[in-house]
Amino acid sequence: MKRTFQPKNRQRKREHGFRARMASAGGRKVLANRRKKGRKSISA
């Protein structure tokens, strides 16, 4: 059985990146919550 995590930078950015988060209301909420919590990094 192959491992489930096969890292790809393009896929990572497209699915979890800042612009992907900003594209939907839910994603913007995620960023707001991470900013409020004081996360060092707010998106991939």
Curated annotation (Swiss-Prot):
Region (Disordered): 1-44
Membrane-spanning ranges: none
Cell wall biogenesis/degradation among keywords: no
A GO biological-process term: translation
Molecular-function GO terms, alphabetical: structural constituent of ribosome
Heme as UniProt keyword: no
Family, as annotated: Belongs to the bacterial ribosomal protein bL34 family.
Name this polypeptide is given: Large ribosomal subunit protein bL34
Source taxonomy: Bacteria, Bacillati, Bacillota, Clostridia, Eubacteriales
